[in-house]
Amino acid sequence: MGGPAAARTGAGGLRALLLALVAAGVPAGAYNLDAQRPVRFQGPSGSFFGYAVLEHFHDNTRWVLVGAPKADSKYSTSVKSPGAVFKCRVHTNPDRRCTELDMARGRTRGAPCGKTCRGDRDDEWMGVSLARQPRADGRVLACAHRWKNIYYEADHILPHGFCYLIPSNLQAKGKVLIPCYEEYKKKYGEEHGSCQAGIAGFFTEELVVMGAPGSFYWAGTLKVLNLTDNTYFKLNDEAIMNRRYTYLGYAVTAGHFSHPSITDVVGGAPQDEGIGKVYIFRADRRSGTLIKIFQASGKKMGSYFGSSLCAVDLNMDGLSDLLVGAPMFSEIRDEGQVTVYLNQGHGALEEQLTLTGDAAYNAHFGESIANLGDIDDDGFPDVAVGAPKEEDFAGAVYIYHGDANGIVPKYSMKLSGRRLNPTLRMFGQSISGGIDMDGNGYPDVTIGAFLSDSVVLLRARPVITVDVSIFLPGSINITAPQCHDGQQPVNCLNVTVCFRFHGKNVPGEIGLNYNLTADVAQKEKGQLPRVYFVLFGETAGQVSERLQLSHMDEVCHHYVAHVKRRVQDVISPIVFEAAYSLDEHVMGEEDRELPDLTPVLRWKKGQRISQKNQTVFERNCQSEDCAADLQLRGKLLLSSVDEKTPHLALGAVKNISLNISISNLGDDAYDANVSFNVSRELFFINMWQKEEMGISCELLESDFLKCSVGFPFMRSKSKYEFSVIFDTSHLSGEEEILSFIVTAQSGNLERSEALHDNTLTLTVPLVHEVDTSITGIVSPTSFVYGESVDASNFIQLDDQECHFQPVNITLQVYNMGPSTLPGSSVSISFPSRLSPGGAEMFQVQDMVVSQEKGNCSLQRNPTPCIIPQEQENIFHTIFAFFSKSGRKVLDCEKPGSFCLTLHCNLSALPKEESRTINLYMLLNTEILKKDSSSVIQFMARAKVKVEPALRVVEIANGNPEETLVVFEALHNLEPRGYVVGWIIAISLLVGILIFLLLAVLLWKMGFFRRRYKEIIEAEKNRKENEDGWDWVQKNQ
C-alpha cells in the first residue's frame, strides 16, 4: 500500500492518484489510519522504550503506557537497569513528553518479599509485558520476568518473575504479584523455581493471566489469578507439565471459546516438539484447575508457532476466534506467518487460512498480533500483525479486517516503519489498540519500535460509506429507435445515477469525483462498448463529474445513452459502473495539537470502489427459457478437383470452400454466430452468400474465424446458407489431415439435448502428389583395355599394382510436382563381378548429393586391387587368342548376376526442381583382362522411390521413375609379342608338314612314275608327221 510519500502529493496530482487507485481497487496510502500525522513519543536511549505498549484511559484522559525493560529508574537509582513503565499523555502534551510511573517498590537489593523471599531487581526487565483490564476503570498489569528471589542465593538464584497491578489512575500504590513464589522452595529447575512469570500477560475482567515458561524445567505453565477470590488456578495436566523445554506460557491470551459467557485461557508453547503448540484451557472454578479443551500444532520445525496469540471474535458470532503467530516460519528465511482458527462452537476451532503479509525475507511476520477493535466502523473487529524485522529491521505492521466469514485474507493496509520515519527500528514489535485516543469515535493504534526507543500513535480516520444507485430501464427495445444521433434514428435508454453518504463523526461536506462508464463488461474484455454517451457533440463511453455532498443528502444526475447501430451481441447484459473517489473535505475548526482528520472511503475488501447495475436487450421468446436450437450442416469443396478425389493434393489445390448451412429450430437466436477453428497455415479469402442475409465474418485470430449470422437476431424457423473460402497454397503438409471445427452458438440458452448438432468437424487428408523422374549419364561411355594399352591411360592407387579405369555416373532426380516431394530414396545397382565366384571389379570412391541435400550409404571394396592368377601355357594362350568371343552383357536383371547396390536418401524436393547425385568409381582392368570377350557391356540401373509413410502419391501414367545407364569396356585384340613369334614358327612348321604330306601322297599315287621319254618321242613323231600329207592315212 502507499505511504506518506503518496499522501503528500499536490491537490491536482492527488485527484489523479485517487482516481487511478480507485480503478485499481486499493485505497490511497493507508486505509483509515492516518500515516501523515503520526504522534511519536521518544524514550531514553538504549532503554528498549516501546518493547511493550498499552493504550489506556482514565476518566477523559488518554494515555499511552510504554514498557522500557532496559531503562534506569529514577525512583530506584541504586538498582542496575531494572526497566520502567512510562506514561505518555495524548492530549495537552505538545512536547510529547513521557514520565516514569512510580510503583513504590523497594530500592535496595535484598528487600524482603516473604518469609523466604528477598528481591533482586537488577536487570529485571520491568515493562516486558503490559495488559489492561477491559473496563472503564480497568487496572494495568506490568511485569518483569527476570526479577529474582535471592533468599537462597548461596545455593540458587531463583528467577521467579514479578508483576504489578497498577490502579486505573496510575497514581496510587498497586498490588504486587509474585505468582511463582512458594515458601521454603529453593530448587532452581523443579516446579516454579525458574518460572519467569510475566514474560507475557493478559487481563480479563476477573482474571489475570501470566505466562511462566520456565516452570518444571522449562516445560512452562500458566499462572491464572482469580481477582474475585484472590486464588490461582492450577495446571495439573501431567502430559503437558512433563514435556520439558516447550516454553508453555511464552504467549498468553483469553477469550470466550467454549461459550459466550465462559472465559477460557490460552497458552503458547513455541518449542513443543520443535514445531510449537497452542493449548486452550477452561478455568474450572469448582476444582480450581485449568482443563485442556483444545490444542493446535505448528507445521514446521523451528517456526516458533505459538509465540504470539490473539483472541478476537472476527465474525461477531459471540465466540472468540484465535490467531497464532509463527514468526520464524521459513520458506526462504524467517518470513513468518499467522494461522487463523475460526470457532465452530463448544471450544472446537478449525483452521481457516494463513496470513503472510508480503512474505518478506526475515520479516518475522507474526511477532506480535493485536485486537484493534472496529477501526473502520463496519461492525467487525480488525487486527494488526507486526513484522518488526522487515526491511532490514525497520519493521512493518499489516492491518486485516474481520467479516462475516472470519477474516479478509488480503490486508487493507501496510504501515512501513521506514516510510513513517527513517529512524524507526523494530517497528511492530509491540502493538496496542481498541481505544479511541483522539475522541473521534474510532479506535486508534499504538505501535512500538524499541530499537529506536520510539512509540508511534496512529489515529483512525472517519470512514465514509457512499450509497450509489444506478437506475436503468428493465430492457432495451432495439427494433424501434426512440432517439436521434444527428439525422440517424438510434435506440437509446435513460441512465440515472444517485449518490449519498453516511458515516460516524464525519464533519462538514465532502467532494466526490465519479466516472460513469457504459458497457463496462465489454471494456474489461477488451471489446468496444455497445452504448455511448453524447457529450458536447462527441461520443464517449464514459462521463466524469464532481459532486459536493452533504451528510445523508442524495444528489442525482441524468444521462441518455445511445445504442450503436448493428450491435452484434444483444444477449449479454449492458453493465453501467459508477466508480468514485473523494475529492475535497470541508473541515471544521482544527485543534492545533490533534487536528481533525479527513475521512476516507470504505474499503471493499480489495475490490473496486464502485457500484454497478445492468439492463438487457428486449427479446421475443415463445418458451420460458428462450432456448434456441441451432442445427449445423456443412460440406468441403476443393477448387478445380473432382469431387470424388479423396484427398487434397498440396500445391495442386489453390483454395478450399466450406459450404455451411445453419438452421434455428427454436426461439429467436440472439448473437448467433458460426465459428471456424482452422489451421494457422490457411488464409481466409472471403465469405460468399447467394443474397444479402446479414452475415458478416471477422478473422479474430489467424486460426479462428467468426461469422455473425442474422441481425439483430436469427429468427425462429429460419435457415441461412453461406460459404467461406480459404487459401491453401501455404499448407506445409506437416499435418496428415486438414481439419475444420465448425461451431454454431448463440447468446441464448440451448438445451443440452439440442447441442449434438451444433458442432461439425470436416476433414480432408493432405497428400503430396508428385511426378518424379530420374535420368543418368556415365563418363566415359566406353574405354579400351588390354596388354598393349598404355598404362598411363589408367589410374594406379598408392602401393597398388592394379590399373583402374575411372567411371563417373551422374543421376538427376526431377519433381514435376504439383506438390513438394517431402523425401525420397534413390538406389543404383550395377554388376560388380564377371562371374559368381569372381573378384569385385569396382571400388566406390564417393557418392554425393548436390547442395548436401541428402546422404548416401557407401560400400567400399576392402581389397580393390586383385590380379587373378591362372595356370597358363603357350597353347592355352594361343587358343584364347583364336577363340575370342564377341560381346558380353552384364545386367543385374539376368539370373545369376552378382551386383552392387548403393542407396541415397534425398531431402525435400520442391516442385519443378531437381537433385543431382554423383557416383565416383574405379574399375579394376586387371580383372577384365582375364575375360575372353572383346566387348563387355555394363548395365547400371537407377530407381527413385517415394516413401508411402510420408503420404506421397505418384501421378498415374507419369514420367518413369527408373533409368538405365550403359557403358562398355573394349578389349584390345592385338596378341602379345611372344605369341606372334610362336604363331610364325608354328605356321612354318605346319606348312612344311603339309608339303611333305602332299609329296608323299603324290608319290603314292604314282605321280613321280610317268613315261616322260615315250611321251617326248611320240610328240616328236607327231610333229614330223604333220609336215607330210599322209599323216592321217598312215595313222589309220
Curated annotation (Swiss-Prot):
Localization in the cell: Membrane
One record GO biological process: neutrophil chemotaxis
Cysteines paired by S-S bonds: C88-C98, C143-C163, C180-C195, C483-C492, C498-C556, C621-C626, C697-C707, C856-C892, C899-C904
Keywords: Calcium, Cell adhesion, Disulfide bond, Glycoprotein, Integrin, Membrane, Metal-binding, Receptor, Repeat, Signal, Transmembrane, Transmembrane helix
Keyword rRNA processing in record: no
Gene Ontology cellular component terms for the protein in this record: basal plasma membrane; integrin alpha9-beta1 complex
Regions that span the bilayer: 982-1002
Pfam family, one: Integrin_A_Ig_1
UniProt family annotation: Belongs to the integrin alpha chain family.
PANTHER family per the UniProt record, alphabetical: INTEGRIN ALPHA, INTEGRIN ALPHA-9
Protein name: Integrin alpha-9
Natural source organism: Mus musculus
